[in-house]
Amino acid sequence: MKMTGLASEQAAPITQGWYIALSFAVALILSLILTSRDKAFWNVYQGKKETIPLTIVWGILGFFLVFFGQMIGAAIETAVFGIEGGSQNTADIVAIAKGAPIAILAIVVFGPILEEFVFRRVIFGSLVQTTNFWVAAIVSAIFFAIIHFDFSHILLYTICGLIFAFLYHKTKRIWTSIIAHVMLNGFVTLVQFYAEPLQKFLQELEKMQ
């Protein structure tokens, strides 16, 4: 028995959503298992790390830093390069999440944690020990931007990568950048999910005035 065209189109996002969620979950679990065997893996910085409460505070502040950093980056993209706002990459991912809400876990939780492991701990953390903050931050941020395959907005991703690196460097705790990254992805997902209903609501308010 074959699916109809409509049924096939509806099934595709669901399949993709579950695949993304499960693959990210497995990758995260494997990463945690492998890194737990090396006690020195997280000891990138010498000296005292930031306290847990201040780590959380810096993580929340970091979200706002990234948010405003993206606003500045978007303004530069528009003014200098004529690039319009909005990301097709983000829109595609959110479309999958709407078809399979399980994918939200990958977008908001699993993905950010994995990306912080790879780009901040592995790439930035390795380079900062042999070079300096700026070299490590710029290189890791560029790789972070490239891996998203949204080259029209590479400046925005690079800015995010630089700020995440700063947060990790400032507090000496990877959880700081993870908190900021999770909050950013969660905020973007929430806005994308409710952008259309919110727009309709505002239009109705205008009609009532």
Task: Put a short name on every predicted segment.
Residues 8-14, 41-111, 129, 197-209:
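Juxtamembrane helix-loop-helix connectors linking adjacent transmembrane helices
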Residues 56-72, 76, 109, 113, ...:
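Hydrophobic, lipid-facing residues on alpha-helical transmembrane segments of integral membrane proteins
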Residues 137, 141, 145, 152-209:
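Functionally important transmembrane alpha-helices
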Residues 114-139, 166-173:
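Membrane-interface helix/loop boundary segments of multi-pass membrane proteins
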Residues 32-42, 167-171:
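Structural signal for the C-terminal ends of transmembrane alpha-helices
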Residues 113-118, 122-123, 150, 183, ...:
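Active-site His/Glu-centered metal-binding helix of metallohydrolases
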Residues 1-38:
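Alpha-helical transmembrane segments in multi-pass membrane proteins
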Residues 17, 21, 55-60, 101-105, ...:
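Hydrophobic alpha-helical transmembrane segments
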